[in-house]
């Protein structure tokens, strides 16, 4: 089983704030995510600028595309994104359109599982050639005190068994990682637990060490 990658979510509102994070921890992570908040605040230039600074890193545009899949994904890929996200409630043709464009750029599409979705949809995504999903505990659910539970672990295992590369996100803390041991997680996303740490560098390194210990 290969080691899960570590992704930092830049849900900053400005590029200046995002740069404060990347200057410290870009070399400690595998993937730099231009979070939805940053995408809205700064547009696709955030993707372009971060990829220019870190060409050796995977840069994800977390656009959460809900419609106009070809147009929006092309905007992201032309800004040199490696991956883009499509929200799970989008029509299957939106996901297909985004994937078609991704292939032109040797990129990839992730389905963001935020909110309601079904296993029938999951099968449609697989049938359409989608390889990646993001299992997401929402920011608002976290704020309401919703913790990771057995239902989450069961769903993640089932998605993996279907052949998806599964990314896990949603207020992920270091102590949560052992919950997922034994599952071939593709990526773990950490946002505030790295960005807001007293030492973001050490926080990122602790995540990497824990991943190596649990999956190595």
From Swiss-Prot:
Substrate binds at residues 11, 192. Mg(2+) binds at residues 33, 62. SUPFAM superfamilies: Ribulose-phoshate binding barrel. Keywords: Carbohydrate metabolism, Decarboxylase, Lyase, Magnesium, Metal-binding. GO terms for biological process: 'de novo' pyrimidine nucleobase biosynthetic process; L-ascorbic acid catabolic process. The record marks 64, 67 as: Transition state stabilizer. Its EC number is 4.1.1.85. It is an enzyme of class 4 (lyase). It catalyses: 3-dehydro-L-gulonate 6-phosphate + H(+) = L-xylulose 5-phosphate + CO2. PANTHER family: 3-KETO-L-GULONATE-6-PHOSPHATE DECARBOXYLASE SGBH-RELATED. Homodimer. Catalyzes the decarboxylation of 3-keto-L-gulonate-6-P into L-xylulose-5-P. Is involved in the anaerobic L-ascorbate utilization. This is 3-keto-L-gulonate-6-phosphate decarboxylase UlaD. It comes from Escherichia coli O17:K52:H18 (strain UMN026 / ExPEC). The lineage of its organism: Bacteria, Pseudomonadati, Pseudomonadota, Gammaproteobacteria, Enterobacterales.
């Amino acid at each position: 089983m290969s080691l899960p990658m570590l992704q930092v979510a830049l849900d900053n509102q400005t590029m200046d704030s995002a740069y404060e994070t990347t200057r410290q921890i870009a070399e400690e992570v595998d993937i730099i995510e231009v979070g939805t908040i940053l995408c809205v605040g700064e547009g696709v230039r955030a993707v372009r600028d971060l990829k220019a600074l870190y060409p050796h890193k995977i840069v994800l545009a977390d656009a959460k595309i809900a419609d106009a899949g070809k147009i929006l994904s092309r905007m992201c890929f032309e800004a040199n994104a490696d991956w883009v996200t499509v929200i799970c409630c989008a029509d299957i043709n939106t996901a297909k359109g985004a994937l078609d464009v991704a292939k032109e750029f040797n990129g990839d599409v992730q389905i963001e599982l935020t909110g309601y979705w079904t296993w029938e949809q999951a099968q449609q995504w697989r049938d359409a050639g989608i390889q990646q999903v993001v299992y997401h505990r929402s920011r608002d659910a976290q704020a309401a005190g919703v913790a990771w539970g057995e239902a989450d672990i069961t769903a993640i295992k089932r998605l993996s068994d279907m052949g998806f590369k599964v990314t896990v996100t949603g207020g992920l803390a270091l102590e949560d990682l052992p919950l997922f041991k034994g599952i071939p997680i593709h990526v773990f996303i950490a946002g505030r637990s790295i960005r807001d740490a007293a030492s973001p560098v050490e926080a990122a390194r602790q995540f990497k060490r824990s991943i190596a210990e649990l999956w190595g």
